[in-house]
A protein has these predicted regions:
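Short loop/turn segments at strand-loop or loop-helix junctions that form parts
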Residues: 3-13, 47-49, 63-69, 129-132, ...
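Short, charged/polar "capping" segments at the starts of alpha-helices
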Residues: 16, 48-55, 135-138
């Protein structure tokens, strides 16, 4: 039997954060999905002060210690965890064959774990599942049946990852932080570089309530820039080892986004990558 660990980063958010209403819905959807499978363990990685929000049925991994603000100074101090530390915890503390990582505001359809297991059985080594966006008026766990029935709209963002735990030792996560754009970049790049990574774009498997894009706030621009520069550094590293890396559809999409955001404030690695891929799209 394939053993799966699903890791998430609970946050004891306060109003007006969308996470106040999103997290209970996310965790309830996980519990429902667990009823339809076996050998899946949901693991929480969090700061000690966030423990009150963590469901009792989560396996609690060793608390996070560092944040991106320990590495450099930002205009507005936010205690945002390093993605690497989060994945280090689950890969070191579990004996799972496969790891699933999703954000704490990503709801699961009841058949989610069954689908993931079936793809692994069919030979998919690693894959990224694109979420669907459903209307933003849902606020209550009791509305989950209605949320499930929403077809929703397709979204290109990467926020659900499935990969073999044994591959993680080859990954280069850099110092990207959670909670702001481009947190997904180095994991996506690492999965592609490790080989046989697929993007599942149109399946009805995960959902996000609304599309408020609060992460576009101007006071968080330097966090976004930090993550983008880290992603470019890692992608350039992988491209130097294998020129075909840049042609993968997942990398193609990341580079497309990077080109559209490129500014004089981005690193030389960003400039170089965008110059290398001037023919994209």
């Amino acid at each position: 039997m394939i053993r799966i660990a699903h890791v998430v980063n609970p946050v004891d958010a306060k109003p007006p954060s969308d996470l106040v209403t999103a997290q209970p819905i996310t965790y309830a959807s996980m519990q429902i999905a667990l009823h339809n499978t076996t050998d899946v363990e949901v693991c929480g990685v969090f700061y000690p002060e966030d423990e009150p929000i963590v469901p009792s049925w989560f396996r609690k991994l060793y608390p996070l210690k560092r944040s991106v603000s320990y590495l450099k100074k930002f205009k507005v101090h936010r205690k945002l965890p390093l993605f690497k530390e989060m994945l280090d915890r689950v890969c070191e503390e579990t004996d799972a064959d496969y790891i699933i990582q999703t954000n704490c505001d990503i709801g699961l359809m009841p058949h989610f774990y069954q689908f993931v297991r079936r793809q692994i059985e069919k030979g998919y080594r690693s894959f990224i599942i694109n979420k669907r966006i459903i209307p933003g008026h849902y606020k209550d766990v009791k509305d989950l049946p209605e949320m499930y029935s929403e077809i929703g709209g397709q979204h290109n963002g990467y926020d659900c990852f499935v990969f073999p735990r044994e591959d993680y030792r080859y990954y280069e996560m850099g110092d990207v932080c959670m909670g702001v754009p481009w947190s997904e970049g180095t994991l996506s790049a690492s999965m592609v570089a490790a080989g046989e990574c697929t993007s599942i774009k149109n399946a009805h498997l995960t959902f996000h309530i609304g599309d408020s894009r609060t992460w576009l706030a101007q006071n968080l621009v330097d966090y976004r820039l930090h993550n983008t520069n880290e992603v470019a550094r890692v992608m350039k590293l992988f491209a130097g080892k294998d020129p075909k890396f840049l042609k993968h559809e997942i990398i193609n999409w990341l580079l497309f986004k990077m080109k559209h955001e490129l500014s004089p404030y981005h690193s030389q690695n960003c400039q170089d990558l965008c110059a290398l891929t001037s023919g994209l799209r």
